[in-house]
């Protein structure tokens, strides 16, 4: 069976994303999914990036995945501002679209999947003349697309961003299939059978429950240093925790995605509070080791589409304390059994929940055991069978 070769043409799957040099959850699960699809022998898998520029992948990808980098730096150049940059942005957009269309024409895929939600990607794929099924993967809930507008103070910029987001949502709705991460997101789109819910999968699931008897006095959180993740709220929470439990520490591991603004704000908040037990770390590929050095996980996000970090932490036997934000936490955490859910953005309630978790050791251990068992359903073999059924149906 190992030498079996199908006598039919393999279905060609083309995946389009910005780059694979980030250490974020999207890149982590995508690298695994593409590798497993290619290794299955059922598909010819193509990964197309446009901003990799020779940088190494953050996560390993099978050699059986065909890789193409368009090397246009389109997204980076679109962030330039000023009168003289307008022409450069226009030229880069045209160059990018031509390069992508040439690439797709050469591959002639059966399925084209947009992984990143950039307007240029979406419009280029939608306008590209082909019989291929066009798929968009939404890693952010529908209403959450507007959440980032809250931090924009300039009315002109806010209105401009709102219009762009409206265009993105309209373009997404034109795709043949929309893949979301939770059933709540699926119902919010209200587009019938064209919307499919497929959750993220675990990269790794320990065969045995990790030993959680050693007390570390450490709480962990993992994610980008960005407004979405609510780390500013978490630092305010920790000011309250520090008064009751100064022997406990908070460790945040995150990437910057080229923007240090949010991280610098957090550093100022920590310095102003004079807390010595809050630590901001760079993102790490050894995140499971960090989970195992911690007692429980806290999520302070303003919104989440799923929360890959939640199931990762739970697979290590960590219970969760989280805001009950849209959309992910409630679809994963059973309140009182595998963790504690606090009202969205309620600093006081989240602090109370963290204190409860600290002060009730036996209950924390029990929740951790329940958490480990509950996320077995996200093992790769189960989630990949759902993906394969999806691709075979197209």
Predicted regions and their residues:
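Short, structured helix-loop element that forms part of the nucleotide-activated donor/catalytic region
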Residues: 54-60, 251-276, 363
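Aromatic "clamp/platform" in nucleotide-sugar-dependent glycosyltransferases that forms part
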Residues: 283, 302
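Short hydrophobic beta-strand element within catalytic cores of glycosyltransferases
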Residues: 319-323
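Conserved acidic donor-binding segment of nucleotide-sugar-dependent glycosyltransferases
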Residues: 334-336, 340-347, 356-362, 376
């Amino acid at each position: 069976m190992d030498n079996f070769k199908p006598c039919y043409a393999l279905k060609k799957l083309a995946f389009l994303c910005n780059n694979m040099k980030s250490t974020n959850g999207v890149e982590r699960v995508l690298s695994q999914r593409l590798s497993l699809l290619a290794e299955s022998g059922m598909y010819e898998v193509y990964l197309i990036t446009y901003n990799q520029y020779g940088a190494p992948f953050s996560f390993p990808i099978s050699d059986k995945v065909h890789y193409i980098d368009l090397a246009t730096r389109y997204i980076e150049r679109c962030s330039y501002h000023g009168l003289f940059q307008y022409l450069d942005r226009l030229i880069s957009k045209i160059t990018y679209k031509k390069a992508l269309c040439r690439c797709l024409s050469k591959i002639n895929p059966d399925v084209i999947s947009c992984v990143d939600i950039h307007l240029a990607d979406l419009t280029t794929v939608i306008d590209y003349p082909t019989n291929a099924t066009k798929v968009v993967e939404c890693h952010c809930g529908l209403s959450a697309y507007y959440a980032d507008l809250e931090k924009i103070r300039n009315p002109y910029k806010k209105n401009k961003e709102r219009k762009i987001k409206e265009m993105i949502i309209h373009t997404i709705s034109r795709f043949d299939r929309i893949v979301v991460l939770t059933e709540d997101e699926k119902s919010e789109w209200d587009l019938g059978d064209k919307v499919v819910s497929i959750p993220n999968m675990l990269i790794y699931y320990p065969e045995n429950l990790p030993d959680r008897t050693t007390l570390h006095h450490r709480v962990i959180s993992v994610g980008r240093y960005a407004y979405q993740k609510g780390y500013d709220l978490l630092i305010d929470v920790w000011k309250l925790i520090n008064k009751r439990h100064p022997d406990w520490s908070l460790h945040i591991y995150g990437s910057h995605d080229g923007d240090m603004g949010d991280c610098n704000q957090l550093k100022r908040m920590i310095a102003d509070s004079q807390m010595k037990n809050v630590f901001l770390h760079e993102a790490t590929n050894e995140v499971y080791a960090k989970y195992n050095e911690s007692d429980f996980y806290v999520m302070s996000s303003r919104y989440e589409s799923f929360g890959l970090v939640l199931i990762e932490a739970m697979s290590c036997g960590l219970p969760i304390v989280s805001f009950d934000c849209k959309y992910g936490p409630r679809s994963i955490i059973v309140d009182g059994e595998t963790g504690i859910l606090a009202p969205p953005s309620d600093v006081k309630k989240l602090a109370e929940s963290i204190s409860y978790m600290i002060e009730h050791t036996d209950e924390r251990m029990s929740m951790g055991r329940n958490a480990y068992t509950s996320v077995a359903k996200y093992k790769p073999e189960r989630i990949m069978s759902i993906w394969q059924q999806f691709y075979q149906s197209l």
